[in-house]
Amino acid sequence: MRTITKIGLIIICTYNVTVAQSQQVAIELTMVFDIPYIGPINRIEKITFGPNMRHSIENSKSERFYARLFVNKSKGKIIDINSHNFWKYDIEDKEYWVVPFEKALYKQDTTETKKEDSGKKRSSWSTTIGDDDNTLEGVSRVENYDVILLGKQSKKWVTTFTSANGRRLVLEEWSVPELPQLRLADSLNRALELELGRPDSVITPLGRGFSNMMLTIENIPHELEPIPGEIIKAVIKSYGDDDDEPNFSMKLEITKLISEALELRHFLVPNNYKKVTK
């Protein structure tokens, strides 16, 4: 019986690998940031995942003139571990350049430095929730069924983190039942990141959700269960003490999710782009 079980597991694993190698998944992620003094920033990111390959295209636009000078960008990035190629390109200028593949690899020796730098750059709402000087007074959640997303009935979850100084972090998240396409994209992305040397513990799963990640922090006491399914839409709002309007907001949503047969041309720089040196 054990031999039969082992053979069955081998067959299943082989099938999953074969499917992943012959498929690609395209995701479109829309993001809107509303930042004080800068205003709304709209960003659309299209990512195509393949076996040990990833092609991301980013378009960012700002509504305010002075912010447009720095934010408005259309660019792409392709990583292909199979051929050890790393390209970046500018969509508006129709130019591309080769990046040394070593720059795509995860550098373990800079982890501590990155942690320190990220801690300095993070917003106050992400650094003070649950800190010793600003203890968390409570975590609450309400839920109800909501709109159809990606053809699935969604469920809306509103999780509120309230700190001792009156600040609130409100996470609105919409979940749907498990999506095979998103699971495949997550599997392909995880395999690529592992090949690049990134530890499994720091790879963020696709569709996991912000509140699920925050509730794993040790100094945040709660009795909430993780949100089940795939979280494909989220609105994050940060409020100051007694503020009715958020001082920061961010909206993210997976608007397209397509699984199709692998086409290698989707992981190449457009042939009408000019090669430059940077």
Residue ranges and their predicted role:
Residues 2-10:
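Sec-dependent signal peptide recognition
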Residues 6, 15-16, 145, 173:
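Generic hydrophobic/packing signal
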Residues 10-20:
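Hydrophobic h-region of N-terminal signal peptides that target proteins for export
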Residues 23-278:
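Extended soluble regions of mature proteins
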